[in-house]
């Protein structure tokens, strides 16, 4: 199963070339991830972006699909496909690490988190 999200492209997201700034793709991924999994206390340990096609200001609605690509003991991988209509414009991959908000240290995934993530797991 994949989580579906929409992201609005704002004027402030553009760079001097008139397309969405490269750093903004990670903001889009973050917004979609939060809507999908706000129940999990986590931090980003790694992020990578494959830029496939530029996004311009006229491309106001970006469709983002999210799924889990790996589940470990205290971390999991997430893939985000970003599309403008039918056109794939970027693929973002992150590694998330679950943390304790009290100790600020990594901790193992609990059963509820693991069950949630398994619903979105694609190998």
Q: What would you call each of these model-derived segments?
A:
Residues 1-61, 69-123:
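Terminal targeting signals and extreme-terminal segments of soluble enzymes
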């Amino acid at each position: 199963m994949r989580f579906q999200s929409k992201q609005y492209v704002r004027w402030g997201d553009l760079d001097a070339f008139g397309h969405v700034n490269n750093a903004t793709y990670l903001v889009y991924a973050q917004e979609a991830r939060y809507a999908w999994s706000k129940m999990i206390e986590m931090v980003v340990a790694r992020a990578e972006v494959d830029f496939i096609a530029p996004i311009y200001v006229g491309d106001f609605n970006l469709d983002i699909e999210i799924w889990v690509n790996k589940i470990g003991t205290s971390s999991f991988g997430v893939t985000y496909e970003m599309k403008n209509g039918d056109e794939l414009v970027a693929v973002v991959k992150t590694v998330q690490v679950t943390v304790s908000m009290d100790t600020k240290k990594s901790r193992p995934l609990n059963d509820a988190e693991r069950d949630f993530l398994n619903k979105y797991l694609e190998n």
